């Protein structure tokens, strides 16, 4: 087992990725107000705003972090995965719900102990 790992990824925005989202009519039409255009889980949502991005996360074992005196900002106590076989743009509720259930059971924690969930949302009725 590794003491420390670096995880990262990036997505570029290009003609083909934009065209694929345009083809399924998933863009917001609120281009006159970009700051309020993307509204994940909002009742009045009407689509996403395209963009690229990148992120890197450095994860290390608890023991390794303590040994080097690092401030503990968060702890991964469990994880869950469920491939429901649906398309990324039209997920069903059963797959993500099963993932959360597996995570809670494996970690021995209750939903009330969760302080933050980072969700993937498209600001579309079918994707949210």
Language-model segment annotations:
Residues 3-46, 79-93, 121-126:
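Acyl-CoA/ACP chain-elongation machinery
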Residues 2-3, 115:
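Short acidic/polar active-site loop segments enriched in Thr and Asp
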Residues 32-109, 113-116:
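Condensing-enzyme catalytic core mediating Claisen C-C bond formation in acyl metabolism
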């Amino acid at each position: 087992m590794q003491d420390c790992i670096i995880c990262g990824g990036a997505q570029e925005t290009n003609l083909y990725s934009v065209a694929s989202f345009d083809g399924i009519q998933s863009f917001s039409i609120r281009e006159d107000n970009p700051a309020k255009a993307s509204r994940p889980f909002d009742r009045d949502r009407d689509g996403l705003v395209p963009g690229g991005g990148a992120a890197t996360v450095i994860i290390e074992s608890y023991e390794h972090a303590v040994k080097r005196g690092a401030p503990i900002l968060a702890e991964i106590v469990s994880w869950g995965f469920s491939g429901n076989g649906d398309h990324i743009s039209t997920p069903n509720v059963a797959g993500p719900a099963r993932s959360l259930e597996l995570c809670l059971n494996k970690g021995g924690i209750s939903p009330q102990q969760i302080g933050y969930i980072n969700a993937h949302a498209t600001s579309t009725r079918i994707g949210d």
